[in-house]
A protein has these predicted regions:
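N-terminal Rossmann-like dinucleotide-binding module
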Residues: 1-50
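Local beta-strand N-terminus motif with an aromatic residue
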Residues: 31, 70-73, 150
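Beta-loop-alpha module in the N-terminal Rossmann-like domain of NAD(P)-dependent dehydrogenases
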Residues: 53-113
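Short strand-turn motif at the edge of the Rossmann-like AdoMet-binding core
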Residues: 100-101, 127-129
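Rossmann-fold dehydrogenase core element
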Residues: 111-128, 151
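Oxidoreductase and adenylate-handling cofactor-binding alpha/beta cores
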Residues: 131-154
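Conserved small/polar residues in nucleotide/adenosyl-binding loops
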Residues: 159-166
Length: 169
């Protein structure tokens, strides 16, 4: 196998970040740097003990990329930050893997699309709930019904509350 893929992770202390770290490890890629606004010294030491740089901002991660050429930045930050962070990565030709939603409005999604169209990089999003037990069961129930049965479309709402300490202060 050739060179390992190099990743940066933005929002390293967030709820979903450990799953991204696990996925990066599962494909034998290198997590080169992580960033979060709220690192304490113990958290920094833990990452540093694994030869993972700890950074305080996306801007620092961009500088890291300029010297170490990251293949991807994985964005695990609060939703309202995604659009500007994605665009910054695209402007620096860094591929982005971003938690859903990519954007909070159609106009923001259009901004992302426009930025991607002039960038050498691409944006990828995550829809991990397709493997959630409840979703799998729903799909099985839908596909097991006879084809001549009428189907009713109903709105489904899934709420996952994050711990208070994961929100910016």
């Amino acid at each position: 196998m050739g060179n390992k893929l190099k990743f940066g992770l933005l929002g390293a202390l967030g709820y979903i970040a450990p799953r991204h770290i696990q996925a990066i490890n599962n494909i034998s890629a290198d997590l080169k740097c992580v960033s979060d606004l709220d690192f304490n010294s113990a958290q920094k030491k833990e990452f540093l003990s694994k030869n993972i740089e700890t950074l305080d901002s996306l801007e620092e991660m961009i500088k890291f990329h300029q010297k170490d050429n990251l293949d991807y930045i994985s964005i695990c930050t609060p939703n309202h930050l995604h659009t500007d962070q994605i665009i910054t990565c695209l402007e620096n030709d860094i591929n982005v893997i971003c938690e859903k939603p990519l954007a909070l409005s159609v106009s923001d999604l259009d901004r992302i699309r426009k930025s991607e169209s002039v960038s050498a990089a691409k944006v990828f999003t995550i829809m991990q709930l397709r493997f959630h037990e409840s979703i799998i069961q729903l799909k099985q129930n839908m596909t097991s019904q006879k084809s001549d049965e009428k189907h009713e479309v109903i709105p489904v709402s899934y709420t996952h509350l994050r711990a208070h300490e994961t929100y910016p202060h």
